[in-house]
Amino acid sequence: MVTLSFFDVFLRVYAIINSHARVRQILVKGSDGLVTAQAPGKLYIAGEYAVVETGYPAVIVALNQFVTVTVTKAEGIGRINSKQYQENSLTWQRNGDEMVFDNRDNPFHYILSAIRCTEMYARELGRNLSVYTMDIDSDLDANDGKKYGLGSSAAVTVATVKALDQFYDLHMTKAQLYKLAAIAHLDIQGNGSLGDIAASVYGGWIAYRSFDKAWLAAERREHGLSELLSMDWPQLSIELLQAPKDMQLLIGWTGSPASTSRLVDKIAIAQAKERVEYQTFLSASKNTLEGLIEGFRQQSLSAIQAGIRANRQLLNHLATLTGVEIETPILKQMCDLAELAGGAAKSSVLAAVIVALR
C-alpha cells in the first residue's frame, strides 16, 4: 500500500478543508468610511463541464484562500490598487455618476464591471455615489500574477460587490449578491456556469445548477437591476452541503493553470458537431452528480468517492468525444497515485486534482 507520502508528487497542496468552511464576513464599517470584504476561491469537485448547460448539477467547494477588497472614502480623486498589478494602479474621478479613468489599458476588467453594476444598483435605490480608494489583495494568485486556477476572477468580483454593498449600505441578501456578481462577471467572461460566483458568495460545499442565461439576457432588456435581483431565476439552484466528518479534501496543483472560458469555448465548438453523444454525456453527468450529491446528504464517503471516480470516467469520455485534453499526463499520474493510496481523485479544469480520503 502506498503511504500518504505520495502527495509529494503534488507541486502544491493548497488546503485541507473541513466541512464547516464558510465565507469570512466583514465586519464593521468604520467612521472613516473604510470597509473590508473577503470572498474565497473555489474548486469544482465534479460536474464542471456539464454545469455550463442550464439545470445540470455540479458540486463545488469554497477554499480557505481569499481575495480581500478594502474601500476607503476619498476626496476628489480615487484609486484602484492591487498588489498583483502594482504597476497598473488606476486613478479616477467622478463626472456626475460616471467614473472617469486616467488610463483604460488595465487588468481590472472584472473589478470595474463589479463596480459598475453595484453602483447602478445603488443609484436605483437612491444612493448618492462617492469617490473612494479601493485596495485589492489576493491569496489566489502567485506574487508574479500567475493564476492558480482557483476562481480568482469570481472571488474578486464577489469581494468588490460585497465591499460596495457595505460602503453604500445596500443590505443585499446572499441571493441578491450572487445575482449581481453573476451579472457583472457574465458581462466580462460571456460564458460559463457562474458556479464559482456561487461558491464565493455562499462558502463551504454547495450543489449548484446554473440558471437560464438566455432568459437573463432577455429580462435585462426589460428590467432594471433591482427588479432582476428580486426575481426567481429559472433553473438556478444553490444547495448547501455538509461533507462527512471523516473526509479530507486535498488539492494538488500542476503548475499549469487553465483558462476556464477558453476550455468552455472549445467544448462548445466540439459538442455542436457531436450533439447526440454530447446529450448522452450530459445525461450521464446528471445521474452521476445526483448520486454524488445524495452521498453528501447521507454523509456517505463511499458514495462520494464512487461519484468522483464515475465523474473522472465521464470526463475522459468527453475528452475523447471533443478532442480537448482534460486529464493531462501529470494529472493522470496524480489521480492514479491517489487511488493507490485509497482515495478517489479526478482532475479539475486541468489545473488541479482533488482527492477525497478517509
Q: What residues fall within each predicted segment?
A:
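Short, positively charged and aromatic/hydrophobic N-terminal segments
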Residues: 10-12, 16
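A sequence/structural signal of beta-propeller blade repeats
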Residues: 174-175
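DPxDG-like acidic metal-binding loop motif
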Residues: 148-170, 204
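C-terminal nucleotide
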Residues: 21-22, 28-46, 50-52, 60-124, ...
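Short glycine/threonine-rich catalytic loop with a Thr-x-Gly-x-Asp
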Residues: 150-151, 344-351
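Extreme N-terminal basic, low-complexity initiation segments
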Residues: 2-5
